């Protein structure tokens, strides 16, 4: 009996379908399915630096010009525009935000032996848009209390969870959204003194050293081995850097046109060793808060007294929680799942 042959067009369709399935499987593995591990490649030194808390009656220590192990680090942040798009800071936006009348309301003022945290809600109107943001003024007794956590306690791609869930799992007092390291292969990831990845890609990198100092680096100026030798405690890769290391807004940012626009935001800032700012700006909520541009965020961090500041993953991911309760107002009530958080552990 003679077999019926399929027409050429049917064979072509079948080949295309098979190819599409193969491509889909590859994309599923690379970009959707979780790929994780709990093992780091190297450990840096422990964060043993100790700081006097304000209630203990000691003044703030001056910022050190050295990183971790006392190996000389740059006395100011490194700037280069070779690897990423250079977008000028918008002076009109900066001026409008700086001139906006801010109303501050204290929400939380908590003191423990580990940390002293004061969270304020600040409201203002700039460029005819309402803005609501939350600034956590954080003093820690040791750098070891500025901690990070991965979603599901796993390092890897496509592993996500809500900020609230990660905060609860890690018994955090204060927690904010992190840098979403798991969305890219080109990131430097150092967390709680453990090295997971050394590749900075093309984004600015922010490093918190074990001595409590914090510095930002352009990707072209960043060397992972150097900062590890200097005692890197945390390293984040999202950006851009928002201030120049001396409390000034830079002339330009390493960013994208989209990121520069009005968005909800999360940022971390450095005032002095042991003294930091965690900031979340609500946005994309008509009549409540629009969000801020990158230039406005930089001015905000300057007004908060920071010398160095760094933009974290914002948008729907931006969220702040304290003792399990939402401080900010994430989009949709819970926000979006994310790879990681930055947090201060609760007193046990």
Where are the language model's segments positioned?
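Zymogen propeptides
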Residues: 2-200
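Active-site-adjacent helix-turn-beta-strand microarchitecture at beta-sheet edges
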Residues: 111, 181-259
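Beta-strand-turn-beta hairpins that frame and shape the catalytic cleft
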Residues: 131, 143, 213, 271-277
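Short beta-strand segments
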Residues: 137-139, 176-178, 209, 269, ...
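Short, solvent-exposed aromatic-acidic interface loops
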Residues: 151-155, 221-224, 281-286
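A short, polar/proline- and glycine-enriched secondary-structure boundary/capping micro-motif
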Residues: 157-159, 225-232, 287-293
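General beta-strand structural signal in soluble alpha/beta enzymes
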Residues: 174-178, 216, 308-314
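Conserved, well-ordered active-site substructure
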Residues: 185-201, 208, 253-307, 312, ...
């Amino acid at each position: 009996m003679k077999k019926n042959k399929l027409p050429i067009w049917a064979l072509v369709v079948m080949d295309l379908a098979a190819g599409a399935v193969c491509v889909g499987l590859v994309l599923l593995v690379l970009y959707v399915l979780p790929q994780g591990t709990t093992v780091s490649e190297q450990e840096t030194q422990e964060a043993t630096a100790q700081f006097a808390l304000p209630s203990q009656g000691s003044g703030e220590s001056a910022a050190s010009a050295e990183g971790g192990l006392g190996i000389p680090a740059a006395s100011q942040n490194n700037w280069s525009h070779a690897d990423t798009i250079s977008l000028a800071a918008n002076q009109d936006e900066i001026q409008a935000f700086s001139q906006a009348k801010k109303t501050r309301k204290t929400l939380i003022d908590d003191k423990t032996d580990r940390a002293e945290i004061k969270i304020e809600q600040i409201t203002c109107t700039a460029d005819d848009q309402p803005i609501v943001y939350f600034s956590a003024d954080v003093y820690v007794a040791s750098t070891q209390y500025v901690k990070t956590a991965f979603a599901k306690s796993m390092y890897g791609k496509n592993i996500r969870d809500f900020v609230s869930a990660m905060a609860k799992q890690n018994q955090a007092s204060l927690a904010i959204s992190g840098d979403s390291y798991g969305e890219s292969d080109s990131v430097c990831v150092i967390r709680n003194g453990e090295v997971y990845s050394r590749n900075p890609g093309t984004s600015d990198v922010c490093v918190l050293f074990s001595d409590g100092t914090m510095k930002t680096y352009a990707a072209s100026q960043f060397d992972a081995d150097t900062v590890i030798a200097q005692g890197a405690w945390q390293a984040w890769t999202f950006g851009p850097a928002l201030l120049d290391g001396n409390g000034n807004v830079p002339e330009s940012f390493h960013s994208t046109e989209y990121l520069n626009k009005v968005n909800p935001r999360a940022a971390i800032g450095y005032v002095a060793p042991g003294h930091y700012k965690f900031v979340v700006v609500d946005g994309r909520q008509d009549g409540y808060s629009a969000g801020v541009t990158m230039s406005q965020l930089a001015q905000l961090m300057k007004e908060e007294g920071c010398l160095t500041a760094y933009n974290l993953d914002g948008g729907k991911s931006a969220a702040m929680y304290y003792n399990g309760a939402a401080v900010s107002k994430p989009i949709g009530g819970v926000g979006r799942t994310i790879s990681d958080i930055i947090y201060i552990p609760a007193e046990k």
